[in-house]
Amino acid sequence: MSRIGFAPVSVPSGVTVTINGQNVEVKGPKGTLNTDIPAPIAVAQEGDEIVVSRPDDHRKNRSLHGLSRSLVNNMVVGVTEGYTTKMEIFGVGYRVQLKGKDLEFSLGYSHPILIKADEGITFAVDGNTKFSISGIDKQKVGQIAANIRGLRKDDPYKGKGIRYEGEQVRRKVGKTGK
């Protein structure tokens, strides 16, 4: 049984947390995030810690308890440190470049693909094949990274495509010729 929900979230100095009913707002040096916590879960601030509690041990409340604690923790880490996802491109002729604040991909299609930077998201390009996505919202950074990866998923036969840095792709053996 997971005990993630019972661990209090420590609030570092320079971060202010405002709890208004089910709405939690976290302000820090990098920005402001807010989210709504599901109804049966209670959030309270005790000193420099945020405590998340549940009314009973029903299955749904147990799952929402851990989720709510993780959401609050992700917001605190986001406004203090931020989140970065690094990705790389493999394949002949596949490349990425920065166009203003947006990313432009050449992935073997007949047209370049432009990914616009959402509010609070920044892109950085290192060479033609490596880039990173940064922001304070962990969900938004992860979703944009997943959308970009979906533009050209890794091919298990040739190893071409977009992948997360350090991701290992299981290669397959092609058909044997006669």
Swiss-Prot record:
It comes from the Bacteria. InterPro entries: Ribosomal_uL6-like, Ribosomal_uL6-like_a/b-dom_sf, Ribosomal_uL6_a/b-dom, Ribosomal_uL6_bac-type. The keyword NADP does not apply. GO terms for molecular function: rRNA binding; structural constituent of ribosome. One of its GO terms (biological process) is cytoplasmic translation. One of its GO terms (cellular component) is cytosolic large ribosomal subunit. Part of the 50S ribosomal subunit. NCBIfam families: L6_bact. This protein binds to the 23S rRNA, and is important in its secondary structure. It is located near the subunit interface in the base of the L7/L12 stalk, and near the tRNA binding site of the peptidyltransferase center. This is Large ribosomal subunit protein uL6. It comes from Corynebacterium urealyticum (strain ATCC 43042 / DSM 7109).
